[in-house]
Amino acid sequence: GITKFSQLSIFSELNNIKNVSMDEPYAAICGITEDEILTQMSDDLNLLAARMKLPRVEVLEKLKDNYDGYHFTWPSPDIFNPFSLLNAFADGKMDSYWFGSGTPTYLLEMLNKFGVLPSKIGGTEAVAADFDAPTEHMTGITPLLYQSGYITIKDCDTQFGIYTLDIPNQEVRIGLMRSLIPSYITRDTLTTNTTVVNLARALNRDDMDGALRLLQEFLSTVPYCDNVRSEGHFQQVFYIIFSLLGM
């Protein structure tokens, strides 16, 4: 992401720079649109569909679910994350490329500092000054989440100038929730990830009893928080697990 810094003084040369971050004519300048995929990258889409052995239309929908959904102003076309999209085309498969590029240690520290729960990341409303703002003196985590790509604009009430912000796509949601596992569930991420996979398998074959049994067994291994926040802690554990399941 690109972090916004405040102009240092009224005489700063930075004042000569025009900020086009939320200007509609530049809405698609930092990413790739669906139209560009269907035209300029059509051969890449066909090749990916062939390698995944899926219809082209289905592959496009999967790409949208995983890497699409960014908006830097409103109205705006849906913007794909170019880093993840190009890696998917190059590898012939869909993976978690963005989170593979680095661990969001600073973000996790800030989530803890501002007391932001996993279930409260995204799904919020804000005016532009609350998120398109310098981060060096931020009093909340929204500017950092927005400018680093963890949340994006999803809607806008233009009459009142208030924006709806949310997590852009499945790649970001699942990657973010995986990074929260050590803080909220257990440092043994292997157990959590395999449990989630086995839960998905059970749900896919409509084995609700098996899914509940897996969930109960897993929760019995989560350290109990002997304080007034214990119930809320387990609520966040459930939220992370079901987010990892794509729900």
What are these regions (language model features)?
Residues 4-15, 20-88:
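Amphipathic alpha-helical segments of the small helical/lid subdomains adjacent to P-loop NTPase cores
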Residues 78-247:
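Extended alpha-helical interface modules used as scaffolds for assembling large macromolecular complexes
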